């Protein structure tokens, strides 16, 4: 009979403990074996047995993972499977739950690929910070590939169609086999050292993991990472990945896409050039228009500030002053002309118009502003002296000082002497503010 102090387990508890031990004690494992008892129910899950000559293990691959298998699982097929050990508690079945499975021919290569990829990742060879940007305009391109493969035909066809001016050097190489990796590495290093190329393209068409294995070589990966020239990798189809893709500066899913990435479409380029030319013409016209407007404004300012312009302005002012002065003088002369013949003769002899003409002629001969200003001041002083002289001889000025001009009303003749009048004669005396009629009472000479 069992010791009451010992723990008594139920089947569920025991299976749960066993499951925990299996899942905790075994990490992710790889198993290479032969498929047997393959079934796929309506759920889409895949159930089978992996076996060798002496043992077997039940396996399950659930629908989200089995959908992505690249082959059709069948009886007797040798595979490489990856999964975790577990226990199906309801029946106590020990089994392997898989998340990846491939045909066994690629199994060893896949493990080597994963190990090398993890090591190079840890070294930072795949870091985005170390990758170089492609130049905006590629002028010389080196293409490392098989000269007889479909990849080179696709690349050259796209390049010729999109940008025929590109200079392309084909560096022929093996792209699969034992010596392919060394040959590709050597060509890459020589092309990079030459400094001739803007970009180096490494490419080939699709194939199995074994066919593409040259592009998973560690020496090639390190050569790509060390290259000073930007490197583009386009190996296989879109779903294929190689170490050269991860370490290259740019990865293209196919050779054709790589060619499209490297060069612009010449039709698009021509359109861009035309748009740029139109924009440049527009900017030039705008700049020219602005420059002409600025030039016109400067020319106007220069003309306005030039000595000649200043002289013309002063000349116009002088002419205006002369016209005003002449108008005033003519008004006075017109009133006195009929009455004072001699005064009119004196006024005509001192007519300011002749003096103004002389002054204007001298002003036009003066260009520098300072000299013109001095001459203008001198002429203004002279005009004032002439005006004072005219006022001194003007009959009106004499009358304004308290004198009178005496004339005969009958004929307007001026009485110049007391001897010319007789007692009782009626005369007219012209005063400053009007005239009066007078009669001679007596006279003395």
Swiss-Prot record:
One of its GO terms (molecular function) is exodeoxyribonuclease VII activity. It comes from the Bacteria. It is found in: Cytoplasm. The keyword Cytoplasm applies. It is an enzyme of class 3 (hydrolase). It catalyses: Exonucleolytic cleavage in either 5'- to 3'- or 3'- to 5'-direction to yield nucleoside 5'-phosphates. Keywords: Cytoplasm, Exonuclease, Hydrolase, Nuclease. GO terms for cellular component: cytoplasm; exodeoxyribonuclease VII complex. Its EC number is 3.1.11.6. GO terms for biological process: DNA catabolic process. Heterooligomer composed of large and small subunits. Belongs to the XseA family. This is Exodeoxyribonuclease 7 large subunit. It comes from Xanthomonas axonopodis pv. citri (strain 306). The gene is xseA.
């Amino acid at each position: 009979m069992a010791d009451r102090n010992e723990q008594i387990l139920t089947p569920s508890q025991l299976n749960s403990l066993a499951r925990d031990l299996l899942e905790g004690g075994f990490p992710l494992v790889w198993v290479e074996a032969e498929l047997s008892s393959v079934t796929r129910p309506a759920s889409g899950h895949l159930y089978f047995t992996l076996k060798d000559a002496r043992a077997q293990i039940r396996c399950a691959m659930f629908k989200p993972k089995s959908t992505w298998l690249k082959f059709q699982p069948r009886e007797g097929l040798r595979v490489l499977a990856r999964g975790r050990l577990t226990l199906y508690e309801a029946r106590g079945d020990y089994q392997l739950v898989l998340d990846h499975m491939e045909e066994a021919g690629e199994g060893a290569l896949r493990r080597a690929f994963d190990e090398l990829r993890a090591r190079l990742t840890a070294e930072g060879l795949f870091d985005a910070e170390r990758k170089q940007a492609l130049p905006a305009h590629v002028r010389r391109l080196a293409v490392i590939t098989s000269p007889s493969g479909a990849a080179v035909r696709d690349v050259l066809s796209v390049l010729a169609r999109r940008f025929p001016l590109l200079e392309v050097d084909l560096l022929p190489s093996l792209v699969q086999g034992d010596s392919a990796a060394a040959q590709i590495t050597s060509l890459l290093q020589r092309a990079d050292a030459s400094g001739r190329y803007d970009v180096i393209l490494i490419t080939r068409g699709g194939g199995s993991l074994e066919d593409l294995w040259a592009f998973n070589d560690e020496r090639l990966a390190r050569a790509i990472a060390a290259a000073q020239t930007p490197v583009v990798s386009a190996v296989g189809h879109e779903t294929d990945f190689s170490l050269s893709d991860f370490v290259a500066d740019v990865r293209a899913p196919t050779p054709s896409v790589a060619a499209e990435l490297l060069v612009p479409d010449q039709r698009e380029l021509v359109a861009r050039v035309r748009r740029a030319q139109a924009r440049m013409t527009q900017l030039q016209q705008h700049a020219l228009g602005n420059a002409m407007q600025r030039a016109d404004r400067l020319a106007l300012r220069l003309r306005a500030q030039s000595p000649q312009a200043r002289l013309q302005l002063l000349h116009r002012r002088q002419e205006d002053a002369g016209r005003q002065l002449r108008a005033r003088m003519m008004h006075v002369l017109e009133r006195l002309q009929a009455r004072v013949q001699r005064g009119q003769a004196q006024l005509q002899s001192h007519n300011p118009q002749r003096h103004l003409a002389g002054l204007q002629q001298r002003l036009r001969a003066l260009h520098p502003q300072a000299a013109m200003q001095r001459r203008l001041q001198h002429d203004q002083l002279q005009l004032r002296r002439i005006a004072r002289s005219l006022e001194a001889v003007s009959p009106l000025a004499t009358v304004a000082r308290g004198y009178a001009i005496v004339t005969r009303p009958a004929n307007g003749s001026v009485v110049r002497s007391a001897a010319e009048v007789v007692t009782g004669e009626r005369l007219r005396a012209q005063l400053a503010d009007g005239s009066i009629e007078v009669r001679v009472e007596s006279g003395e000479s």
